[in-house]
Amino acid sequence: MDNRIIYVVSDSVGETAELVVKASLSQFNGSADDTHIRRIPYVEDIGTINEVVSLAKADGGIICFTLVVPEMRKYLVEQAEKANVLYYDIIGPLIDKMESAYGLTAKYEPGRVRQLDEDYFKKVEAIEFAVKYDDGRDPRGILKADIILLGVSRTSKTPLSQYLAHKRLKVANVPIVPEVDPPEELFSVDPKKCIGLKISPDKLNHIRKERLKSLGLNDKAIYANINRIKEELEYFEKIVDRIGCQVVDVSNKAVEETANIIHHLKTKGR
């Protein structure tokens, strides 16, 4: 049969409905090529439904739809039946079954799948951001970040950046070293975006010694020398005082605990 047409009606983009229709058509030899799919997205009023039903009646088309709002679903079904137009509700019956089986109430919000997709891509973007602007490798990230972490070596800057990225926050981190001037960008951003990571000298001394041992190196190296550590921490204090940013003590905290504190500070500061 020539000029076959299927109307895909949705209160969102309509991708889900169109994929189902195409999958169904693929079961018939040549049907996908011979059938025109017309997508009608963002249907929010009965006027559009009336128009689609009239078109489908005129050209013998089928209406396949994903309308989550019960009133809109009901109206389309009523109008299609009055006009003797074939229709298929792709998502409604399954939502009804789930409500009945699980004792839950659906949100009935159009576009939930797209919202989930957007949330996922925001997380991926934040993770990629954390990798790109890790360890101060590109100071330009400081100006783009939601949060800037600064601290001496082995204060969990990188794992914290990754953990916070999973909360959709773009985090740059900057190492503080006495011999290296901090990037000027640190002093031009809103101090509320900056978080200093403080740690006790003894705790840092222990962490660095263990790090050297794990690398098969001598734990007497200057990197783990207590006097050197104190020098680094004093310099760190000068920098955070100059910036005027908040400081979080990470001495006896797990990464998750510190990340939650930082996330709370960020949320509170909005």
From Swiss-Prot:
Bifunctional serine/threonine kinase and phosphorylase involved in the regulation of the pyruvate, phosphate dikinase (PPDK) by catalyzing its phosphorylation/dephosphorylation. Belongs to the pyruvate, phosphate/water dikinase regulatory protein family. PDRP subfamily. Keywords: Kinase, Nucleotide-binding, Serine/threonine-protein kinase, Transferase. ADP binds at G151, V152, S153, R154, T155, S156, K157, T158. InterPro entries: Kinase-pyrophosphorylase, PPDK_reg. It comes from the Bacteria. NCBIfam families: PRK05339.1. The lineage of its organism: Bacteria, Bacillati, Bacillota, Bacilli, Bacillales. This is Putative pyruvate, phosphate dikinase regulatory protein. It catalyses: N(tele)-phospho-L-histidyl/L-threonyl-[pyruvate, phosphate dikinase] + ADP = N(tele)-phospho-L-histidyl/O-phospho-L-threonyl-[pyruvate, phosphate dikinase] + AMP + H(+); N(tele)-phospho-L-histidyl/O-phospho-L-threonyl-[pyruvate, phosphate dikinase] + phosphate + H(+) = N(tele)-phospho-L-histidyl/L-threonyl-[pyruvate, phosphate dikinase] + diphosphate. It comes from Bacillus velezensis (strain DSM 23117 / BGSC 10A6 / LMG 26770 / FZB42) (Bacillus amyloliquefaciens subsp. plantarum). One of its GO terms (molecular function) is phosphotransferase activity, phosphate group as acceptor. Its EC number is 2.7.11.32, 2.7.4.27. Transmembrane segments: none annotated.
